[in-house]
Amino acid sequence: MYKIDISERTLHFKQPAGTSRGVYTTRHSYYLTLTSDELPGVEGVGECATLPDLSCDAKPEYAVTLRQVCQMVEQMGRIPYDMIRAYPSITFGLETAFASFFDAAKKFLEIVPAEGASSSSEILTQKGVSVPAGMENLVDLFDSPFGKGEEGITINGLVWMGTYEEMLARLEEKLQVGFHCVKLKIGAIDFFKELDLIKRIRDVYTQEQVELRVDANGGFLPENAMSQLEALAKYDIHSIEQPIKQHQWPKMAQLCRETPLPIALDEELIGVNVRSMKEALLDTIRPQYIILKPSLHGGIYGCNEWIQLANQRGIGSWITSALESNIGLNAIAHYAAKVYGPDVKMPQGLGTGQLFTDNIPMPLEIRGDKLFVVK
């Protein structure tokens, strides 16, 4: 029988994080500690973290709902996926807790499946640790070349919104430490100043040397969006995230049809938690890419669904963290390694664990432009 304890923590940003929805100075998270009477002393930890004004489940009654869902999981012995589709951050926190519990259980029981032998799930079950149906994919989440410290995941450097001078300084810092893919959050200052910043980069670096991604966070007006996309396209931009605000499907579909540079949907996916609605969105808008954040887009279960549907339609994808602490970031990195591995080609939007003054220690480190697990 499983038991889940809930704790809270507020993390503090080293410097204010500017987004299109304001500036974050703190980050509030709930942590789930999962134990089982089948294996005393073994535990798994997951993080449930919403973003105010962005997450579809960032509601005043969140703490009460979280407690109720955890009690449900304790009684059922599994994650009731269909019942909690509207709560992606809770789904992801539970998945992370179970995945880290199973990983700890395998180490405690010294389970190392041989090739062609029984799966880790089967061996755990044989040793008295039940693996709920539909959750077998969580058992080996941390078992990959990345998880063993053998491979790194290429990530993009993120340049937050700020003044022209601040963004330029942050950009130069990212390039100096070795990033070859840089993402600029735009929309905070005059568009032509941001364009000038991009021009500065291209005056020095070709697209082969530095891949540029931009994130408009829905900041373009529909009537101006196409001309702004055309202006950006002159500088060999890899992609632009969410050029206009979400919930404008006909206009976004038109932009995706006529755009001179690839469009990636991000906020557009938030709150679209039912499979049939996901199909309708992808079939209507037909984006070039979708960007998946487990805390916002349905946890691992929901993101797997998005990736499957996107692949069927020839739509690309990558995975991004969403200002989680190292608990969430660690799980997202392992998930990206599983989904796109063993050799992850496309740079992922994973945080570096260096955003907060009081982050939770985790064996992750950046070497150049790659994220590694330290063994």
List each model region and its residues:
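Catalytic core of soluble alpha/beta enzymes
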Residues: 184, 189-330, 334-336, 355-366
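A glycine- and small-aliphatic-rich helix-loop capping segment at beta-alpha/alpha-beta transitions
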Residues: 339
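Active-site donor-binding loop signature of nucleotide-sugar glycosyltransferases
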Residues: 48, 242, 350
